[in-house]
């Protein structure tokens, strides 16, 4: 088992970190009862001791995060870790190297897990038996801390080995570029205008009813953020859609909709009615995007074929080069800022795809 030290006063670690260089970082968090993920543990190592830093101990941690963010980090599949830390510290680390990204550029599975990577590189078995642990409960059990520490134990050696292999193939800059993309704050910023897209069943709504659903979804999003509670705790999807479909004009109308709880009407009925009423003045087109036509389907198929051929020549998965979702956004939504048209992808496949448009 890895050596670890539980740190209950995060700021006390600052001097120790100050003399270190690159850091391997992982987090444990929970979001079952909150809108924002609750950071429950941060694992950090510079190659010797593994520190398990407890953010729930009640001690200050501003100096800790200021120091942490001044370092270069190594993470594995780090997008969620970065999101949690960005919400907490409102800043990004100096740079990151994502070992999952790097592995994909060497022809390993595009979404290879940490345990799979460690097995592939070092022939070491890591057992993921505590993925569903309650990380917010204190005190943390020793086996939880050992499991958490293991999640960073091999990150720095993995970074070193992946860097060596990438450099030998002339792909190190690719991994650095794709890792840097994960530090774009826009990836972690809420876009309330897109909240309706998260609603299953909203695709069947048109005109005023869709406008009402969007207004209600926007209200729910803001309320969930304000109260730091899951969206479904504020207003369940099916209830939201039922309200939008019926377009109630009074609390009596609202209460008569099957499935709308009376306590919901009493608590926020006026807010729901206000959102529905505001939708009457919406002039923007709220109809859902049209499904791709035959010409667009043919173009997507051709693009996928060319991406697959290029990816095969590189020995990497097609989705590592350009996913179906990215290609669809280019064709249907007109996304000309896609990473497919930028950086290392532009020369390999982006310009070829652009000529098809």
Regions found by a protein language model. Name each.
Residues 1-23, 27:
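N-terminal accessory regions of nucleic-acid-interacting proteins
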Residues 3, 43, 48-61, 67, ...:
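Active-site-proximal helix-loop-helix substrate-binding element of RNase H-like nuclease domains
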Residues 9-12, 59-63:
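A generic local structural motif
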Residues 142, 162-357:
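Accessory DNA-binding and partner-docking regions appended to nucleic-acid-acting proteins
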């Amino acid at each position: 088992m890895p050596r670890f030290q539980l740190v209950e006063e995060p700021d006390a670690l600052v001097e120790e970190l100050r003399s270190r260089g690159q850091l391997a970082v992982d987090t444990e968090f929970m979001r079952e009862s909150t809108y924002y993920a609750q950071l429950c543990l941060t694992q950090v190592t510079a190659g010797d001791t593994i520190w398990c830093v407890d953010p729930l101990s009640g001690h200050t941690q501003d100096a800790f995060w200021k120091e942490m963010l001044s370092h270069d980090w190594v993470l594995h599949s780090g997008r969620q870790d970065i999101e949690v830390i960005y919400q907490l510290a409102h800043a990004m680390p100096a740079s990151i190297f994502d070992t999952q990204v790097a592995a994909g550029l060497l022809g390993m599975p595009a979404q290879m897990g940490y345990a799979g990577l460690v097995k592939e590189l070092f022939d070491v078995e890591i057992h993921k038996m505590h993925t569903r642990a309650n990380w917010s409960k204190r005190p943390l059990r020793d086996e939880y801390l050992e499991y958490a520490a293991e999640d960073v134990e091999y990150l720095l050696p993995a970074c070193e080995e992946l860097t060596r292999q990438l450099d030998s193939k002339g792909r190190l800059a690719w991994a650095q570029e794709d890792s840097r993309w994960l530090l774009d704050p826009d990836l972690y910023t809420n876009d309330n205008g897109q909240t309706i897209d998260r609603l299953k069943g909203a695709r069947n709504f048109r005109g005023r009813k869709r406008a009402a659903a969007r207004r209600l979804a926007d209200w729910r999003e803001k309320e969930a953020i304000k109260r730091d509670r899951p969206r479904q705790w504020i207003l369940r999807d099916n209830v939201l859609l039922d309200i939008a479909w019926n377009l109630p004009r009074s609390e009596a109308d609202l209460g008569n909709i099957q499935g709308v709880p009376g306590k919901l009407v009493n608590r926020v009925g006026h807010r729901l009615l206000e959102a529905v009423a505001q939708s009457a003045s919406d002039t923007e087109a709220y109809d859902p995007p049209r499904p791709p036509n035959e010409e667009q389907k043919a173009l997507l198929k051709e693009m996928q074929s060319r991406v697959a051929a290029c990816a095969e020549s590189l020995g990497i998965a097609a989705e590592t080069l350009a996913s179906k979702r990215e290609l669809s956004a280019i064709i249907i939504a007109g996304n000309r800022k896609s990473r497919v048209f930028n950086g290392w992808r532009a020369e390999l496949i982006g310009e070829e795809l652009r000529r098809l448009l």
